[in-house]
Amino acid sequence: MWKYSRRLAPMLLGLGMAGCASYLHSDAPPVQVYTLRADAVPSGGTADAPSARAASLRVAHPLAGPGLGTSEIVLLQPDHRMDFYAGSAWAADTPALVESLAAKTLRASGNWSSIENADSPFPSDYLLQIAVRRFDADYSAGTGAPPTVHVAFDCTLGSEAGRRILASFAASGSAVAGANKLGEVVAAFQRAADQALTSLSQQAFAAVQTARPAAADARAR
């Protein structure tokens, strides 16, 4: 009996390893991963208006609109149908991607003493909350033409101490893809995101420029 068991053991081990190998094999196509870059934006201030530049700003983790909380690249079809590009994804989930882009854009503007991400341990003067309303390629016209990419943010800016709201504003951008190819669609996402982020940066800076002198006047009274 022991003799037969010793003969069967290598056979069973081989079958087990073959089974593991079959589970590890996948016929699914590889996922193409895409990312976007933050471009430098012009300063929104003037040489005699240093008030906002003396301030620090924290970018809170963005809130995601329905269907926008994953790393999938979203497209909209006719009849209000939401879908995703197969075999492709952003390098991070959409809120994390937007947070990174917003922080880099604000930092590159030179309008702030420091820009902190949501998880930074350092305190900040102001807090920016972004809600991602749109981040999609829109095919809803149903004409077969290349999609129009829409990027839209709803933003709330407030003082971090006391959470007093200073301003609420929208920032958006759109761009038509050059062709019905994913590379062209991603390029349109880049252009639309650049527009939205530039608007966000300039409006946030303007809001703090307005708020800081007003707060100083109120304390002086």
Stretches with model-predicted labels:
Residues M1-P10:
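Bacterial N-terminal signal peptides that target proteins for export
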Residues A21-P95, A207-R221:
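A structural "domain/chain start" motif
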Residues G16-G19:
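C-terminal motif of bacterial Sec signal peptides marking the signal peptidase cleavage site
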Residues R81-A89, A161-Q202:
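Short secondary-structure boundary motifs at beta->alpha junctions and helix caps
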Residues P62-A64, P78-H80, R133-F135, D154-E160, ...:
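Solvent-exposed coil/turn segments that connect beta secondary-structure elements
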Residues R53-A55, G69-S71, P78, A86, ...:
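Envelope-exposed proteins and targeting segments
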Residues A21-D39, S43-G44, S109-A161:
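Surface-exposed short loop/turn segments
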Residues A103-N111, S201-Q209:
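Sec-exported extracytoplasmic/periplasmic mature domains
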